[in-house]
């Protein structure tokens, strides 16, 4: 029965590749034949078979979210609140940052002034002097809290990826152990390990490449009631010359509570770093790679969805009498009445929607919302979409090519790709991205869509590029009313493998729209439009082996 089920799965996967590489389809077909013949497992212990389930994305089950968009204004996006909590705030609480240095200085200031909580989620913490300075700031703030109170209030929770945070002799873990040893009651360090990296696969894949199977990729930096959403990691490059995006949400306790609970939920299903550099799971928790995978993913899904659903319920109740009075459609209170009534805050002009994507746990909210935004974008609307690694899912590519809005897609030129100049196989990764970019550009040209869909490459001497997200300009508007900002980069890994989180910021405030517009312009100013001549440059030559391998490995990056 197991062999028959496996064969059926492989045949479905192979059938799902109408436009995929024939070599991959053939590989899946051969694997299905081998499964159906029921050969002894020992004769099939090849690394290719172990990797086979990862060579193609799972059969997609998501369709565009049905929605009824309001005809005018930012409120047309209120359908998102059917999926996630909606946080209404004043635009004066939102600040868009522009540079790595500004991001780094803000992190230090926020750590030093934190009184109640510091919550940081990142892929990893670097090991250089700048990162050590951050750790020192944490230590000083914890020490002050300890001296000020017999029962100190400050709690520090750090969530990192296990594989990336454990790489090398000096790593994220060794950077943080002194904090655990000095403040064991106040500091928690959680290391997420993907449930997909287990068994022989875990033994066979080298340390440098095991992160390709799946990661904790969320980047949230939270201090009391202030929240920074970004795509930047806690590493010196992201503090100096690696361009990313960053937004600060100030004095936003409800949003801070949500992301605290989200990080806690992921932390609860993660390995806990101990003072002696060992790790262990919380008592009673299923192990991510030694325990039952299905049960582990079920528990993780329940924990995360509890956070989302409870926050959504709280927000509906909290704002019932201000700007969404009831599900029956009763009118909202006038602003002067709501301000006068029991000291309520004025009606918000900006709405924050947290979008979570954790495909290993069956959570695909960000994917649903992104696909719906692309689907519903009207004719003459403009979408500026940026990604440091251009490897869009087939669904996103089809929507871009098949819908009506204008697209300006910003991506990294090979020279500002984070893998440019890397040793070994990793050094060929920029060429793989060039190959993917060229294929997409050819599709655009074949459909005669060059005017509607334009690619632009970011290029800046001495810098690398890691910005991701989008800005949506409604038809006839010169300013964006919506942006997506956070960790997802619209690629296969982001959608299918990693844990991701971003926010949709919807605003009616012209000053905030101007901030977002200036952010977009500043990034795009460092770019040039891609044309057919771009791929004729010597630096864009892609070796044959890269062209052959890229279709097989594109689901890993």
UniProtKB/Swiss-Prot annotation:
Its EC number is 2.7.8.5. One of its GO terms (biological process) is cardiolipin biosynthetic process. Its main location: mitochondrion. Residues 323-333 have a biased composition (Polar residues). The active site is at 217, 219, 224. Residues 212-238, 461-494 form the PLD phosphodiesterase domain. Functions in the biosynthesis of the anionic phospholipids phosphatidylglycerol and cardiolipin. This is CDP-diacylglycerol--glycerol-3-phosphate 3-phosphatidyltransferase, mitochondrial.
């Amino acid at each position: 029965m197991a062999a028959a089920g496996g064969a059926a799965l492989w045949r479905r996967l192979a059938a799902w590749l109408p436009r995929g590489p024939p070599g991959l389809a053939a590989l899946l077909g051969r694997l299905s034949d081998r499964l159906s013949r029921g050969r002894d497992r020992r004769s099939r212990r090849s690394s290719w078979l172990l990797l086979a389930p990862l060579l193609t994305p799972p059969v997609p089950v998501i369709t565009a979210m049905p929605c009824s968009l309001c005809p005018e204004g930012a409120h047309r996006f209120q359908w998102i609140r059917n999926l996630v909590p909606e946080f209404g705030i004043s635009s004066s609480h939102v600040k868009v940052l522009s540079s790595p240095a500004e991001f780094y200085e803000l992190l230090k200031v926020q750590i030093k002034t934190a009184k109640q909580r510091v919550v940081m989620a990142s892929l990893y913490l670097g090991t250089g002097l700048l990162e050590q300075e951050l750790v020192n700031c944490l230590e000083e703030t914890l020490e002050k809290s300890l001296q000020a109170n017999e029962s100190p209030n400050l709690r520090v929770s750090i969530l990192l990826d296990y594989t990336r945070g454990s790489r090398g002799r000096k790593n994220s873990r060794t950077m943080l152990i002194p904090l655990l040893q000095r403040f064991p009651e106040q500091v928690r360090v959680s290391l997420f390990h993907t449930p997909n990296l287990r068994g022989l696969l875990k033994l066979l894949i080298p340390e440098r490449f095991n992160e390709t199977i799946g990661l904790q990729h969320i980047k949230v930096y939270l201090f009391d009631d202030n929240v920074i959403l970004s795509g930047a990691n806690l590493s010196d490059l992201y503090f100096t010359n690696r361009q990313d995006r960053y937004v600060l949400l100030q004095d936003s306790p409800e949003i801070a509570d949500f992301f605290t609970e989200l990080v806690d939920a992921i932390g609860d299903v993660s390995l806990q770093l101990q003072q002696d550099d060992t790790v262990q799971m919380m008592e009673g928790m299923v192990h991510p790679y030694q325990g039952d995978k299905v049960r582990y993913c079920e528990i993780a899904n329940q924990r995360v969805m509890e956070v989302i659903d409870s926050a959504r319920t709280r927000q509906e109740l909290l704002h019932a009498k201000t700007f969404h009075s009831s599900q029956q459609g009763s009118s909202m209170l006038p602003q002067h009445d709501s301000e006068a009534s029991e000291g309520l805050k004025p009606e918000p002009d900006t709405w924050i929607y947290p979008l979570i994507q954790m495909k290993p746990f069956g959570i695909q909210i960000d994917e649903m919302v992104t696909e719906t935004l692309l689907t519903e974008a009207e004719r003459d609307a403009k979408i500026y979409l940026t990604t440091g690694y251009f490897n869009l899912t087939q669904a996103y590519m089809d929507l871009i090519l098949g819908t009506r809005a204008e697209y300006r897609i910003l991506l990294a030129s090979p020279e500002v790709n984070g893998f440019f100049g890397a040793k070994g196989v990793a050094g060929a990764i920029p060429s793989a991205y060039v190959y993917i970019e060229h294929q997409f550009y050819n599709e655009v040209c074949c459909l005669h869509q060059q005017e509607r869909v334009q690619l632009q490459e970011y290029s800046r001497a001495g810098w690398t590029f890691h910005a991701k997200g989008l800005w949506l300009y409604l038809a006839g508007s010169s300013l964006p009313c919506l942006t997506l900002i956070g960790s997802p980069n619209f690629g296969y890994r982001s959608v299918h493998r990693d844990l991701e989180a971003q926010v949709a910021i919807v605003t009616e405030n012209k000053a905030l729209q101007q901030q977002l517009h200036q952010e977009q312009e500043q990034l795009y100013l460092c770019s040039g439009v891609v044309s057919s001549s771009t791929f004729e440059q010597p630096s864009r030559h892609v070796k044959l082996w890269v062209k052959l391998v890229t279709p097989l490995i594109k689901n890993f990056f």
